[in-house]
A protein has these predicted regions:
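Cytosolic catalytic domains that perform sulfur/thiol-centered chemistry
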Residues: 1-282
Length: 282
């Protein structure tokens, strides 16, 4: 039985030598793109392979895209195969930012039709706090056969976001920190603010004080308060570039509210077109 949402540090520790488990290290810092790779080289969870947000999980950005466009599904599938991710594999993704980066790969693998992927709850910080093993060895890859079955209904484009903004028939949830949403502070993108009609729910609201996810019942209560009767399929998630928005998608899955969708281009794509409206404040 595979997990498709969260895996505990205890479960991962018990399966470190299990050939049916594949571990992927997704540590990444938006303001220092090589920091994650460098820290991985110094120490990581045994058998973990490194996955880079820019190089592996994104296509090169253009003047019309956000900062982290989705890669060609076939290219990503080839990488998954090279990392040994075939059928009947439990994939565990982790980072050192409580899932903020690793959730991108969690979402992308589900988008490609691989349900057996889970986030390490509490991530690398919890693993270290518990004094679990780390090493600097590079695992030898064993190529696997895997399928590429992208599901287009999980993705929303800018036109649908524009319609939702104007009509209100879908709920747009922005996962960025409050100050970026209001436009008070914008360290990454040239325009500050948010899509008119969107609501702000920073991804770290999904976390308990120890950096693990809140219990399912607490997440469900929180999201039902946001949805106000709307079904999950009428929810569009966004953030700065389609990364931390996946954290809210995962939280809704844990809460028993599956079916919400991602706007991959997010804010950094939205602002490329000056015809798209921008709001500031709450």
């Amino acid at each position: 039985m595979f997990s498709n949402t969260l895996v505990t540090t205890e479960d991962l520790a018990a399966h470190l030598d299990d050939p049916k488990w594949v571990i992927l290290d997704c540590r990444f810092t938006l303001t220092d793109p090589e920091a994650g790779r460098e820290t991985y080289a110094k120490a990581h969870i045994p058998w973990a392979r490194y996955v880079h947000l820019d190089d592996d999980l994104s296509a090169p950005p253009t003047d019309a895209t956000g900062r982290h466009p989705l890669p060609d599904p076939r290219v990503l599938t080839e990488k998954l195969c090279a990392w040994g991710i075939g059928v009947n594999k439990q994939v565990v993704v982790y980072d050192d930012s409580y899932g903020a980066m690793a959730v991108r790969l969690w979402w992308m693998m589900r988008w490609l039709g691989h349900p057996g992927v889970a986030l390490l709850d509490g991530g690398y910080p919890k693993w270290l706090r518990e004094k679990r093993p780390v090493d600097a060895d590079l695992p030898i890859p064993h190529k696997a056969a895997c399928a590429c079955l992208p599901e287009p209904t999980q993705i929303v484009g800018a036109d649908e976001v524009m319609h939702a903004s104007r009509s209100g028939d879908q709920l747009i949830i922005d996962a960025r920190p409050d100050r970026r949403f209001t436009g008070e502070y914008e360290p990454l993108d040239p325009v500050a603010g948010h899509v008119p009609g969107a609501i702000n729910y920073p991804f770290d609201e999904n976390l308990d004080v120890d950096g693990t996810f809140l219990p399912p019942e607490a997440l469900r209560e929180n999201y039902q308060a946001l949805l106000k009767g709307k079904p999950a399929w009428q929810v569009i998630h966004m953030c700065g570039s389609g990364v931390t928005a996946c954290h809210n998608i995962l939280a809704m899955e844990i809460a028993g509210l599956p079916g919400s969708r991602l706007y991959p281009g997010s804010w950094s794509e939205w602002i490329h077109d000056p015809a798209r409206p921008v709001a500031t404040g709450e």
